A protein has these predicted regions:
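Short glycine-rich, Thr/Ser-proximal phosphate-binding strand/loop in the N-terminal lobe
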Residues: 1-15
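Glycine-rich phosphate-binding loop plus the immediately following alpha-helix
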Residues: 8-11, 85-118, 122-181
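Conserved active-site and cofactor/substrate-binding residues in soluble primary-metabolism enzymes
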Residues: 11, 15-19, 95-99, 142, ...
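Short beta-strand-loop/turn "lid" adjacent to the catalytic site in phosphate-handling enzymes
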Residues: 25-91, 133
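Short, intrinsically disordered, charge-balanced linker/junction segments flanking boundaries
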Residues: 2-4, 60, 226-230
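Phosphate/pyrophosphate-binding loops at sites that engage ATP/ADP/AMP, CoA/4′-phosphopantetheine
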Residues: 20-35, 108-112, 222-229
Length: 230
């Protein structure tokens, strides 16, 4: 049986609305006049309502003029913040991080010199945005967090690791130093195998290996930033 796309979208919209009411219903009940803003994947092509990307460079204080509006079945109006896209040398996108960047710019205030700033947003897909004044001029994405999880869970590197809630700063720093030193020039694909070799030669304990790998990956991320941004 084929499901008509229009019917599928209607069902998806109802599911989004139900989730929205569960998450925000009590807030809106207490303050019904509160404006509703949403950002992130809710505005993607697979989200509740698509909010088309804005091209960079873009003044972040102009983003509010490009909100996408939708109305729920109960009459609530939701405004969705658009993501950003960089076209040209290699297409790059962000959704949700643009709102965090705007918050950072507001938090900095007039006392901070924003003529040339690099804003880092760590996460599964880390973003680094080059900002001048109130405008996002360019940005990069690094899949550091997701690659770390994949290496730990789906490669031989994870076989000797022991998950722990403790942070082993010395192991992390060791990974950073190796990535940013002469050996780091061999590249991340070569360096990460040292997690395995240190495990086999008692160079790292099972508890330290994850933080060491994290340091390696973050170190190579920073190396790339240094190569492309002053």
């Amino acid at each position: 049986m084929q499901i008509k796309r229009s019917g599928f979208r209607a069902g998806l919209g109802a599911a989004f609305e139900k989730a929205f009411e569960q998450a925000c219903g009590s807030w809106l009940g207490a303050t019904p006049s509160l404006p509703i803003l949403a950002s992130g994947m809710i505005g993607s092509a697979q989200g509740w309502r698509e909010a088309h990307y804005l091209n960079v460079p873009v003044d972040m204080f102009e983003v509010g003029n490009h909100l996408t509006q939708l109305k729920t079945s109960t009459g609530k109006r939701i405004h969705i913040v658009p993501g950003l896209v960089r076209r040209g040398r290699l297409v790059n996108v962000m959704r949700g991080e643009e709102t965090q960047i705007l918050g950072a710019l507001i938090a900095c205030g007039p006392s901070v010199d924003l003529r040339k700033v690099l804003i880092g947003l760590p996460g599964t897909h880390t973003k680094w945005a080059r900002v001048s004044g109130t405008a996002v001029e360019d940005f990069e994405t690094f899949m550091t967090g997701e690659v770390y999880a994949a290496l730990c869970e789906h490669t031989i590197l994870g076989c000797t690791m022991k998950p722990t809630s403790s942070f082993h700063a010395e192991a992390f720093d060791r990974g950073l130093r190796i990535a940013q030193g002469a050996i780091g020039q061999m590249g991340v694909l070569s360096n990460i195998f040292s997690v395995r070799t240190f495990a086999l030669t008692a160079g790292l304990s099972a508890e330290e290996q994850g933080d060491y790998l994290s340091g390696l990956l973050v170190g190579h991320e920073i190396n790339t930033l240094r190569a492309f941004h002053d």
